[in-house]
Amino acid sequence: MATALSGGFSKNALFILSAALMLQAVLGDGKTLVLLDNPNIRDTHSIFFRSLADRGFDLTFKTADDPGLSLIKYGQFLYDHLILFSPSVEDFGGNINVETITAFIDGGGNVLVAASSDIGDPLRELGSECGIEFDEEKTAVIDHHNYDISDPGEHTLIVADPENLLKAPTIVGKPTDKPVLFKGVGMVADPDNPLVLDILTGSSTSYSYFPDRPITQYPHAVGKNTLLIAGLQARNNARVVFSGSLHFFSDAFFNSAVQKAATGSKRYEQTGNQDLAEALSRWVFKEAGVLRVGDVTHHPVGESTPPAAYTVTDLVEYGIVIEMLSGGKWVPFDGDDIQLEFVRIDPFVRTYLKKNGGKYSVQFKLPDVYGVFQFKVDYNRLGYTHLYSSTQVSVRPLQHTQYERFIPSAFPYYASAFSMMAGLFVFSVVFLHMREKEKSD
């Protein structure tokens, strides 16, 4: 009996362990290092951290100057994600520095950064590495037309309209009419970096400067060029989000009412900060906008398996399964702008794929050109991971027995040849049998 019980227990334990490993493979480890300026931030930003924990993230909280900090051990990353809520740090503790963090991003890690007007050099340098330039220390975004009614007088408690958000629901969530509260430092994007995303910009009347000084020089950021929140998706699909405001993620801003100081402005009982912060965290930590390639098939129409080599002008069918991560599960992706290219150095065929159930497929005729080709799907859309699939095939010319017996375009030449033969035959008959009569006759 004991043996049977122990055997059953072992099977159950193995089943639970395998199920947990499968779930972990789908959701990712979710191990996240959170670096704080001080431990109090864990309490003042508890709603945001609680939402991450409820979604399965394993959060490790440490102060940014902890001497035991480490991102890499024995060549392996110890965490999947990094949260930097330590804007004023001047030197990270342990073996973490800007070079380590950039290596973490190059290795596929995701980073969420929150700055403030008291920004230190490490965050400024990290921003420069990612194509983001922060304004000087002690500066703030100022807007004399779009500030909250509770602003103390510096006009730095900005009310950002949802119209200033990036038009990408995958990144910023569903459209809403609730404005966002912002108090912090301004940023500008490197115009030579095409990977930077302007997630939330200031209004046309905003600028970044010292709030306690008269303006004596042109501000660092002005109008729509003033970035409040910026993002980056690297070419390896690693994601980084920079917020110029640490207060943006705070409980106080999540639960605050908001109303512009302008006469007749509408009052909202709650800001849109919490919804936007949750959407941003889902995107930056790859809970949203993640695509993958499933089964890829190609074969001549009417057959089910690919040949060793296709023949020019064959009618072929190509199919690909594309899935998206949603709620921790892979579900069929719904897109109407996915293209297939048939490439030999340059594309010879470019056509849209049509969705057929959970699969995208298309039929097309191969070009009358032989060589080594690729079926290529290169899908790169705002907010989604870069999707790439390439399948190499050979295309050969027609065999000798595959050519047409008579080519329609050559009919005039056939007619001239046969007419010449017929004319020669008639001429021969006439010449041989139609002799002139002799005089004796």
Curated annotation (Swiss-Prot):
Residue spans crossing the bilayer: 411-431
Swiss-Prot/TrEMBL GO biological process terms: protein N-linked glycosylation via asparagine
Pathway it works in: Protein modification; protein glycosylation
Localization, UniProt: Endoplasmic reticulum membrane
Membrane-side (Lumenal) residue stretches: 29-410
Keywords: Endoplasmic reticulum, Membrane, Signal, Transmembrane, Transmembrane helix
Topology in the lipid bilayer: Single-pass type I membrane protein
One CC-aspect GO term: oligosaccharyltransferase complex
Secretion signal span: 1-28
InterPro entries attached to this UniProt entry: DDOST_48_kDa_subunit, OST48_MD, OST48_N
Keyword Coiled coil: no
Spans within the Cytoplasmic topological domain: 432-441
The protein's assembly and partners: Component of the oligosaccharyltransferase (OST) complex.
Function in brief: Subunit of the oligosaccharyl transferase (OST) complex that catalyzes the initial transfer of a defined glycan (Glc(3)Man(9)GlcNAc(2) in eukaryotes) from the lipid carrier dolichol-pyrophosphate to an asparagine residue within an Asn-X-Ser/Thr consensus motif in nascent polypeptide chains, the first step in protein N-glycosylation. N-glycosylation occurs cotranslationally and the complex associates with the Sec61 complex at the channel-forming translocon complex that mediates protein translocation across the endoplasmic reticulum (ER). All subunits are required for a maximal enzyme activity.
Family: Belongs to the DDOST 48 kDa subunit family.
PANTHER family: DOLICHYL-DIPHOSPHOOLIGOSACCHARIDE--PROTEIN GLYCOSYLTRANSFERASE 48 KDA SUBUNIT (PTHR10830:SF0)
This protein's name: Dolichyl-diphosphooligosaccharide--protein glycosyltransferase 48 kDa subunit
Species in which this protein is naturally found: Danio rerio
